[in-house]
């Protein structure tokens, strides 16, 4: 019987399947940060329960950490979350990369850097973008705080089995189109509910040809398509990325793991519940115009009008988004000015992203009135970028070079938009208020963000660079 990769991982981790109710899966790895863990630890304490397997957990501080140096945190709630995580991890013997640790950074960037997740694993984290780790052929779920507590106590997760959605992206990407553009183009077609009830497997030449960093970007955005998780079959790129890393298997264990990992890709002829095909050459650099990742067009496109939508709900959503974003139907995206440019986040905070942006910035200076901040996703990313001289390129162009953290992806750490400010952001969500009260967010790739900082507005980098 042929199986999809999702079915193989599911079957290997199924602990119990009741006649009614949710099946129970074994969890190999549990990732933690300071925002969704305090209540879970408190729940364990109230029930006099411990953590079942501390070696399965890796923790970091990322959401609330300041990026303008590691000064004292001014927000008392954020400071309390940071302090509480340090106390909880010390009490339970959990490996924590705190703000002073040389490995500190965003959880979904730190974890792959150390080879903590492997193909075929089930991984959980109290964070929506846990789907990032699907780039390694890992079934990775974002979970709620009560589930964080349950996983800590039992190393299991109650989970309904999802349907399977295969998204093929065949062919070769056009110049300056990236994994971020693939993700946004997919969401633009399927909508943010298109993947609801599914686990997505991304496949096709364009996906196979992505770097591991690009694959992480693509899987990171699977949740924005409504999917429970995103997966990419492990291959030689995956194995090369993991080999020699701190938590990767060694010696005979590596050989055994490698043999198992090679069995994970979906069998030829495996049956998916749904299949969607894309042509890579049709995917241009993307930019969102509205307040949802699905409200996205090619950079050379025209902002739609409510009358362009047959669905009355989407038409109303368009009307609302145009009003909030202060742009007009029929407007060219290349005529939209930006105030702030943000490079970073668990979507685009890796070394590849900083290289792409730096390539655009060489010998140029940001436009008058534009603020641009570069926030590496981890200290290892920051150190690598500085070793390559990328920090100097950013600084010479007028950008700010910050310390690692989630930063302006969400308004929780001092990095945020003020009312009415418009950003070009490499993060993953453009909801109302996501980057600050009444802030206006446009999602783009790193190269697109860098170009916008120079021009002062969005540009079609295929012609501009």
Swiss-Prot record:
PROSITE patterns assigned: ACONITASE_2
Necessary cofactors: [4Fe-4S] cluster
Enzyme Commission (EC) number: 4.2.1.33
Binding residues annotated for [4Fe-4S] cluster, in chain numbering: 346, 406, 409
Catalysed transformations (reactions): (2R,3S)-3-isopropylmalate = (2S)-2-isopropylmalate
One GO term of the biological process aspect: L-leucine biosynthetic process
Group of enzyme by EC: lyase
Cofactor info, note text: Binds 1 [4Fe-4S] cluster per subunit.
Functional pathway: Amino-acid biosynthesis; L-leucine biosynthesis; L-leucine from 3-methyl-2-oxobutanoate: step 2/4
A single MF term (Gene Ontology): metal ion binding
InterPro entries: 3-IsopropMal_deHydase_lsu, Acnase/IPM_dHydase_lsu_aba_1/3, Acoase/IPM_deHydtase_lsu_aba, Aconitase_4Fe-4S_BS, Aconitase_4Fe-4S_dom, IPM_dehydratase_rel_enz, IPMI_cat
Family annotation (Pfam families): Aconitase
Cysteines joined through disulfide linkages: none
CDD domains xrefs: IPMI (cd01583)
Cited Gene3D superfamilies: Aconitase, domain 3
Superkingdom of this protein's organism: Bacteria
Keywords: 4Fe-4S, Amino-acid biosynthesis, Branched-chain amino acid biosynthesis, Iron, Iron-sulfur, Leucine biosynthesis, Lyase, Metal-binding
Family per similarity comment: Belongs to the aconitase/IPM isomerase family. LeuC type 1 subfamily.
Protein's job: Catalyzes the isomerization between 2-isopropylmalate and 3-isopropylmalate, via the formation of 2-isopropylmaleate.
Subunit structure of this chain's protein: Heterodimer of LeuC and LeuD.
Protein name: 3-isopropylmalate dehydratase large subunit
